[in-house]
Amino acid sequence: MGMPNFGDMMKQIQQAGEKMQDVQKQLEKLVTSGEAGGGMVKVTVNGKQRVLSLWIDPEIMDDAEMVQDLVLAAVNSALEASGRMAQEEISKVAGGMINPQDILKNLGQ
């Protein structure tokens, strides 16, 4: 077997970098949500796991502990959905060239 062509390898690395940038842009546009307490708390996040909105039913505002618990549950639900959505999008766009976990680890950068 012959040695790999260095030029081809560099081209593949460049293509992977371009795809990663495209994926990052796509993830910002993807939106999902989570809720808790039967819809008393709703959170919307994007594919980069940034919270875009938080809604709390005014009727539950008197119970601070319940509000805290529901906010945490809704945020975690939305982030889990966002993570699944991001992995699907990365896999779809990258076509096996990029490991979804590599991008997800660097979302905050």
Curated annotation (Swiss-Prot):
Key word Chloroplast present: no
Domain of life: Bacteria
Protein location: Cytoplasm, Nucleoid
Keyword annotations: Cytoplasm, DNA-binding
An annotated GO cellular component: bacterial nucleoid
MF-aspect GO terms: DNA binding
Xref: Gene3D superfamilies: Nucleoid-associated protein YbaB-like domain
Pfam name, any one: YbaB_DNA_bd
Family of the protein in this entry: Belongs to the YbaB/EbfC family.
Cited function: Binds to DNA and alters its conformation. May be involved in regulation of gene expression, nucleoid organization and DNA protection.
Assembly description: Homodimer.
Protein name as it appears in the record: Nucleoid-associated protein Plut_1285
Organism: Chlorobium luteolum (strain DSM 273 / BCRC 81028 / 2530)
The organism's taxonomic lineage, starting at the top: Bacteria, Pseudomonadati, Chlorobiota, Chlorobiia, Chlorobiales
